[in-house]
Amino acid sequence: MSDKKWNPELALAAGLLSGEVTSAQVIEARESIQATDFADLRCQAVWRMIEGMVDDGIDINATTVIRHASKTKLEKHTGPIGPFIVECGEPAAPFQCLEDILDASKRRRLLAAGAELIAAGKDTGKL
């Protein structure tokens, strides 16, 4: 995997699972990492939520992130966060499996964009 480009989604998930992502690191990283740096919409939502948790003084780890996602109803829009974090952060997963996860993420984004276009067309009566 060393010849592949750095993937922020996998890094965030792996960091949450390993306990390497802490509140202090999030505060430090805010200057260089934006939600839009993540290609996956779920990661964007999770990163924004994590920033809010840090602002509220909540410790950051996989458990608190998953619980907070459930409390704030984030999962209603993103789907289950726990399985997503585990899938993305599984260090023993073969690289092909990780690529498949990312491909599935791209498909979800395309479907979501298509649904938005269809909805916009219905709103304007052009469909």
Name the predicted role of every residue range.
Residues M1-K106:
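Noncatalytic partner-interaction/assembly domains of nucleic-acid and motor enzyme complexes
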Residues F84-C88, L117-K122:
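Short amphipathic helix-turn segment from helical bundle oligomerization domains
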Residues A92-F95, L111-I118:
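Acidic/polar active-site rim loop that often engages polyanionic ligands
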Residues A112, A120-L127:
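Non-catalytic interaction/clamp surfaces of large macromolecular machines
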